[in-house]
């Protein structure tokens, strides 16, 4: 990846985080959360979502919607990843069990906050690909 690509992805990630933050405000009455917690915001800003989608979807990686990842599965919408992370109130020192690894994006976001993430995936090919991504 070129430096220009990395900068473009970084600016797209900043816009994605801002859009997710706006959705928190718009859904406050339904969720009880008017803003992302600082640790979830930092994790979303740091984890490179484009690494967790197939090459043909990378140009769409920072849009706030789910994307196909193969085997009939999708990577969750960034807002849903942020909201579900905030709702479990993760803290440093905790361990989290995630059921349904998918591409590994949610696990990567959680790993920025908690001490240990255990993730289980039913589809062997997705589990293998996610494990490879999460090792790098």
Give, region by region, the residue ranges found by the protein language model:
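Class I SAM-dependent transferase core
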Residues: 2-97, 113, 128
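Conserved nucleotide-cofactor-binding alpha/beta core module
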Residues: 87-136
């Amino acid at each position: 990846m070129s430096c220009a690509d990395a900068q473009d992805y970084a600016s797209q990630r900043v816009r994605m985080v801002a859009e997710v933050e706006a959705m928190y405000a718009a859904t406050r009455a339904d969720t009880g959360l008017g803003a992302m917690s600082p640790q979830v915001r930092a994790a979303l800003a740091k984890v490179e979502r484009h690494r967790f989608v197939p090459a043909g979807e990378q140009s769409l990686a920072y849009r706030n919607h789910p994307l196909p990842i193969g085997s009939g599965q999708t990577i969750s919408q960034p807002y849903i990843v942020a909201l579900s992370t905030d709702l479990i109130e993760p803290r440093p020192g905790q361990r989290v069990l995630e059921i349904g690894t998918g591409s590994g994006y949610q696990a990567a976001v959680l790993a920025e906050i908690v001490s240990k993430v255990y993730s289980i995936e039913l589809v062997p090919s997705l589990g293998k690909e996610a494990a490879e991504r999460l090792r790098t």
